Amino acid sequence: MSVAAKYYPNEPTEPKVVTSEIPGPESKAKVASLGEVFDSRPAYFVADYAKSSGNYIVDVDGNKFLDVYAQISSIALGYNNPALIEAAKSDKMIRALVDRPALGNFPGADLEDILKQLLKFAPKGQNKIWSGLSGADANELAFKAAFMYYRQLQRGGHGIDFSEEENSSVMENTSPGSPQLAVLSFKKAFHGRLFASGSSTCSKPIHKLDFPAFNWPHGEYPVYKYPLSENEEENKKEDDRCLAIVEDLIKSWPTPVAALIIEPIQSEGGDNHASKYFLQSLRDLTSKYNVVYIIDEVQTGVGATGKFWCHEWADIQPPVDLVTFSKKFQSAGYWFHDDRFIPNKAYRQFNTWCGDPARMIIAGAIGQEIVDNNLVDQCARVGDYLFEKLEKLQAKYPTRLINLRGKNRGTFIAFDLETSAERDQLLKLLKSNGCNVGGCAEKSVRLRPSLTFEEKHADIFVDALEKSIGQL
């Protein structure tokens, strides 16, 4: 029995669209009503989560969509997963929800077990965790950890105390207590919409407009030619070009670069992939210049690329310093392994909640279900199957499926259209044909199904895609 059949015996066998347009009349009415108390303008439709099942999301009009977007890559196991429902019913979960603890000051007796369950799924080389609330929060926390680590090294070691000048100047937001330091990120990156994470984000103006930003550098992320197997020499030159820019920025930026953050696949920025060579070379550069190396696995993590963590494809040595996570884990935070990233004093990395044990319980259950059901291997297998079908479709419609990418990266697949208007129209047609799919960057389509997405779902999606292409 397949995993989807075991989990979801009542999952729809195919999409069903019952309204003449998406969103339908009931969704439109509810979006308008919701808009009186909440900004509902980004809503595609209003979902009925009680009726959604497995790989299908149902809206309030009764439309049943094959979901190849999964809440912007955040649903790992499909809708109404029975194992997660059982985890939600546990006494441990009830305590975490009803009496949410301030974990820093009053950790529960079960917190160690909750964290050790999560640590079973940490990336190779990482054995410690700091928990947060969202992907952006995870990156902000990682930046703080990097800055504190960097400054302690400058002071002379972990045990060196702050100077009187540091203690007084920090209250005026001036140096040396508030040092001028930078995080290097990449053009087209997305690391969140808060202030530090927003300064490192560089994908769309709408993410950043009107907000003050730190003067931080953005390197060039390599842009490869596809298929990769036919452009190895040229793509290697592109890697080297971008690496030279990164090294120059580290050496010449007016403020010291304390950390570098990168997505192994830029997701919001267009599903741009970084090669093993590029990611390892960044490790070499960060080690050479004593820059903290942060991998942002918020969207790429938890199995979707055919590894539990995407950067494991690169086998980076020595291991990166910090790895941030959220989305499919339904929790957030960063992994690390070096005790020097624990601040030299308490209350430096701190807030009331210090994470959310309820979400950590769910994250642990998600990880266990993934491992017990070999869902990472399944995702790799289904991704290969889906990619092969898309290659055939690309050969048939070469001007409609451009730069197909994500081969051997599970279901983390994307392709381009010629224009943003054409891409937007294709996404609209896909919904009309029963598939909920998302876009990224200016003209890309990204596939982000759950880990319970199987070959039968891939067949339905490819058929709907071909039908939609024919309607463009």
Swiss-Prot record:
Task: Give, as one word, the top-level EC class.
Answer: transferase
Sequence positions that bind substrate: 193
Q: Where in the cell is it found?
A: Cytoplasm
The yes or no answer to whether the keyword Cell cycle is present is no
Q: Which terms does the UniProt entry file under GO BP?
A: arginine catabolic process; gamma-aminobutyric acid catabolic process
Tell me its cofactors.
Answer: pyridoxal 5'-phosphate
Superkingdom field: Eukaryota
Which keywords fit this entry according to its UniProt record? Aminotransferase, Cytoplasm, Pyridoxal phosphate, Transferase
**Residues engaged in binding pyridoxal 5'-phosphate:** 135-136, 352
- Keyword GTP-binding carried by entry: no
Cellular component, GO annotation: mitochondrion
Q: Which InterPro entries match?
A: 4NH2But_aminotransferase_euk (IPR004631), Aminotrans_3 (IPR005814), Aminotrans_3_PPA_site (IPR049704), PyrdxlP-dep_Trfase (IPR015424), PyrdxlP-dep_Trfase_major (IPR015421), PyrdxlP-dep_Trfase_small (IPR015422)
Give the E.C. number(s).
2.6.1.19
Q: Which SUPFAM superfamilies match?
A: PLP-dependent transferases (SSF53383)
Instruction: Tell me the pathway.
Output: Amino-acid degradation; L-arginine degradation
State one molecular function term (GO).
pyridoxal phosphate binding
Q: Which Gene3D superfamilies match?
A: Aspartate Aminotransferase, domain 1, Type I PLP-dependent aspartate aminotransferase-like (Major domain)
Where are residues bearing N6-(pyridoxal phosphate)lysine located in the sequence? 327
The reaction(s) this protein catalyses: 4-aminobutanoate + 2-oxoglutarate = succinate semialdehyde + L-glutamate
Q: Reproduce the miscellaneous comment text.
A: Induced 4.7-fold in an arginase-negative strain during exponential growth.
* The protein's role, per its UniProt record: Required for the degradation of gamma-aminobutyric acid (GABA), which is important for utilization of GABA as nitrogen source and for oxidative stress tolerance. Deaminates GABA to succinate semialdehyde, which in turn is converted to succinate by the succinate-semialdehyde dehydrogenase UGA2. May be involved in an alternative, arginase-independent arginine degradation pathway via GABA.
Self-association or partners: how does it assemble?
Homodimer and homotetramer.
| Family named by the database record | Belongs to the class-III pyridoxal-phosphate-dependent aminotransferase family.
Name this protein carries in UniProt: 4-aminobutyrate aminotransferase
Q: Which organism is it from?
A: Kluyveromyces lactis (strain ATCC 8585 / CBS 2359 / DSM 70799 / NBRC 1267 / NRRL Y-1140 / WM37)
